[in-house]
Amino acid sequence: MRLNTISSAPGAKQAEKRVGRGIGSGWGKTCGRGHKGQKSRSGGFHKVGFEGGQMPLQRRVPKFGFSSRKARFRVEVRLDQLTKVNTDTVDIAALVKARLIPKWAKRVKVIASGKLDKPVSLQGIMVSAGARRAIEAAGGRIGE
C-alpha cells in the first residue's frame, strides 16, 4: 500500500448537491427553499430560542433560588458512620482517612441518623441538634 493508492471505500463519499442549475436538475431556481419568507433568504434564520418577537420561554419563566457556594464543599455524615473511625478525636482528616467523606470536603455536619454505640470526641465538625443529644448521651463530647 502506498499513499498515492489510498482511496475512500465505495459509497463512503456522496457527491455534493449542486443547486440553482436549471429546472431539469430538480433543484433549480428556488434551490429547495420554497418561495419567499425569512428562511428563503441568504443568512435568513432566527437565533436559537427566538419566538418571532414573542417574549421567549427562558425570559417568561420566573427565576428563583440560588446555589450556595459554601454548600458545594459540605458533606453530611450519619451517626452510625462515626463508629467506623478508629481514632480518639474525629475530625475532617480522620473522616477522609476512613473514606467516609471525599477529599474535597471542607465542611462536615453530623446528622442524627442511626445509632451511636460508643463515645466519640468531635473536633471542628458541625452537629445537628438531634446528633448533639445522641453523642452526649453516649458519653462523647463536641469541641469547636
Curated annotation (Swiss-Prot):
PROSITE patterns: RIBOSOMAL_L15. The keyword NADP does not apply. Pfam families: Ribosomal_L27A (PF00828). It comes from Nitrosococcus oceani (strain ATCC 19707 / BCRC 17464 / JCM 30415 / NCIMB 11848 / C-107). Binds to the 23S rRNA. Residues 1-52 are annotated as: Disordered. This is Large ribosomal subunit protein uL15. GO terms for biological process: translation. The keyword Ribonucleoprotein applies. InterPro entries: Ribosomal_uL15, Ribosomal_uL15/eL18, Ribosomal_uL15/eL18_sf, Ribosomal_uL15_bac-type, Ribosomal_uL15_CS. Residues 21-31 have a biased composition (Gly residues). One of its GO terms (cellular component) is cytosolic large ribosomal subunit. Gene3D superfamilies: 3.100.10.10. HAMAP family: Ribosomal_uL15.
